[in-house]
Amino acid sequence: MIILSNKPNIRGIKRVVEDIKYRNQLIGRDGRLFAGLIATRISGIAIGFLLAVLLVGVPAMMSILGVI
C-alpha cells in the first residue's frame, strides 16, 4: 500500500496557476484596448480634422481677408 502525504507540495502548481491568470489578464487587456481603439477611430479622425482646420484654416482666412 502507498502512503500519501496529508499536505502535498502544491507550490509549483500555484505558481503556474498565477502565471496563467496573469497572462490571461494581459491578453484580455490588450483585446479590450484594441476594441476601444477601433470603436473610436472614426470620431477621433473627425475631431482631429476639425481641430486642424481651426488651427490652420482660421488664421489663413483671417490673413486673406485682411483682418490680421
From Swiss-Prot:
Per the UniProt record, the source organism is Methanothermobacter thermautotrophicus (strain ATCC 29096 / DSM 1053 / JCM 10044 / NBRC 100330 / Delta H) (Methanobacterium thermoautotrophicum)
Assigned keywords, A-Z: Cell membrane, Membrane, Methanogenesis, Methyltransferase, One-carbon metabolism, Transferase, Translocase, Transmembrane, Transmembrane helix
Query: What residues form the membrane-spanning segments?
Result: 45-65
- What name appears for this protein in its UniProt entry? Tetrahydromethanopterin S-methyltransferase subunit F
Its cellular-component GO annotations read: plasma membrane
Annotated pathway:
One-carbon metabolism; methanogenesis from CO(2); methyl-coenzyme M from 5,10-methylene-5,6,7,8-tetrahydromethanopterin: step 2/2
Which compartment or compartments is the protein found in? Cell membrane
**Keyword Methyltransferase belongs to the record:** yes
Gene (UniProt): mtrF
